[in-house]
Regions:
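Helix-turn-helix repeat elements of alpha-solenoid scaffolds
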Residues: 264, 277-293, 320-331, 362-371, ...
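Disordered inhibitory propeptide/activation segment of secreted metzincin zinc metalloprotease zymogens
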Residues: 1-70
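Structural motif corresponding to the intra-repeat A-B loop/turn of tetratricopeptide repeats
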Residues: 319-322, 353, 360, 400
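Metalloprotease/metallohydrolase-associated module, dominated by Zn2+-dependent proteases
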Residues: 4-11, 55-56, 139-164, 168-176, ...
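Structural signature of alpha-solenoid helical repeat scaffolds
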Residues: 301, 340-341, 381, 421
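Metzincin-family zinc-dependent endopeptidase catalytic domain
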Residues: 82-182, 187-188, 192-198, 307, ...
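TPR/TPR-like (Sel1-like) alpha-helical repeat modules
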Residues: 329-334, 368-375, 398-421
Length: 447
């Protein structure tokens, strides 16, 4: 289940952009960032993802689809989503080795996985705070509504997966629909949990990663390995992991005993969830963000949760206390620099640090931050971040008197903005806000 990113909440309420437009920018052939992982860490993360639900409930046994898997888009899905699904299915076949293919939508003979697009308000009414979600043993929204609360819709009760339905927001940007597609299809095919301490996975509610990563593909390859099967418990799966990982990640080293202890700090998770949740006054959100940071420090967290605590605090403090936000972003960047596989996190923080530099008139620093982060945003296929960084770079170049370069970067910002934002007017407002951070900013971003 994908939580609603706070900075994109307004995008879901805006009129939908025409995502069927043929000249929307494309990322082309995927070139995912390659993350380096030990087999020991993969084994422990896999077990934590596979035997616990996001709510904290234990899953007694794994369940999965057995045999070839078919996926169908319901007629409500925008045409542009078909191309995104095709790219994703190709990756799942080539990177995760899953026998999966698209098929035509049929009500009388449904695919194993059906993808339906609905108004965001209907999704939020059914599952508050979720931008999108996946449910078992259903193929339509009506079927999901009929069986809500029954044991058939409980992931933890399954012994095998036969059908699943994914519900995406039809009135969102193409990027948000695609991001939902990646996370929900990933959960339909594999683990059901999210872990905040993962740095290289979409199975993490920090929303840094937009698409399934190479690490996620390894998790899915493990989950669907022939030596595993539906109904296996923790001990059986753990016993088979060393051989599986030795085969699919031969440079990852050996797996010793696997630590199965619960890694979730529920007090921290609750505090960060409240800080990022909707419909809460900013002052209270700031209090919850500070509480999450305090818990992380008291608990001696040295993983991504500490970095994310600082990042969340910085985002929330930005409007009312830029100095406090700047200090929080600097701390977050320092922590992520010490952790492996955090290029994407550092690109997001670079956007914030660069924007603060722009606001104080330091065009050189803003240009450095944006130029460094842009290649990571492109490889991680985050159009929203690409558009924002491109506008940051354009404004810095303008301030340095490099007008022709600024115009090229500005045009790139608007091109990717059409993919990353739900509405053209919202895109212009957001990108204009970045341009207007600079002292004596030109109004070129509004033209």
């Amino acid at each position: 289940m994908a939580n609603m990113p706070r900075d994109d909440a307004a995008a879901r309420l805006a009129p939908a952009m025409d995502t069927s437009t043929s000249d929307l920018p494309s990322f082309g052939a995927p070139t995912p960032i390659r993350f380096s992982r030990s087999n020991q860490s993969l084994a422990e993360d896999f077990m934590a993802l596979s035997f616990v639900l996001e709510s904290g409930r234990q899953i007694p046994r794994i369940s999965r689809f057995e045999g070839p898997i078919t996926v169908a888009l319901a007629p409500s899905a925008p045409p542009a989503l078909e191309g995104e699904l095709s790219r994703l299915l190709t990756r799942l076949r080539t990177e995760a080795g899953i026998a999966i293919s698209a098929t035509a939508y049929r009500t009388n003979s449904p695919a194993k996985i059906t993808i339906e697009a609905l108004p965001a308000e209907r999704i939020a009414a059914a599952v508050p705070q979720a931008a999108c979600f996946v449910v078992p043993n259903a193929s339509t929204w009506q079927e999901f509504i009929r069986q809500r609360g029954r044991v058939t819709s409980d992931w933890a009760s399954l012994t095998t997966r036969n059908r699943a339905a994914i519900f995406l927001p039809a009135d969102a940007s193409l990027q948000e629909m695609r991001d939902c597609l990646h996370e929900e299809l990933g959960q339909a095919l594999g683990p059901l949990n999210d872990l905040y301490d993962l740095t290289d996975s979409v199975f993490n509610d920090d929303n840094f990663h937009a698409v399934l990563t190479t690490t996620d593909m390894m998790f899915l390859q493990i989950f669907n390995d022939p030596s595993l099967q539906s109904g296996m418990g923790q001990a059986d799966v753990a016993a088979r992991l060393p051989a599986i990982l030795g085969r699919i990640n031969p440079t990852g080293g050996v797996v010793s005993s696997i630590n199965l202890a619960n890694r979730d700090n529920r007090a921290w998770s609750n505090a960060i969830g409240r800080a990022l949740g909707p419909n809460m006054p900013e002052g209270q959100r700031l209090e919850h963000a500070q509480a999450a940071l305090n818990i992380a420090q008291r608990s001696n967290m040295r993983d991504a949760r500490l970095g994310f605590s600082y990042y969340a605090l910085g985002r929330i403090a930005l409007a009312r206390d830029p100095d406090r936000a700047a200090a929080a972003f600097a701390s977050a960047q320092d922590i992520y620099q010490r952790l492996p596989n955090t290029d994407v996190q550092r690109a997001h923080i670079a956007m914030q640090i660069g924007a603060l530099a722009l606001a104080r008139g330091d065009m050189t620093a803003a240009l450095l931050q944006s130029t460094t982060a842009l290649p990571i945003a492109r490889r991680s296929e985050n159009a929203h971040l690409l558009a924002s960084l491109s506008m940051l770079r354009a404004t810095a170049l303008e301030g340095l008197g490099r007008g022709s370069e600024a115009q090229r970067s500005r045009l790139e910002a608007y091109a990717w903005g059409r993919y990353g934002f739900a509405d053209r007017s919202l895109m212009q407002i957001r990108l204009g806000e970045i341009a207007n951070l600079a002292p004596n900013a030109t109004q070129a971003a509004r033209n």
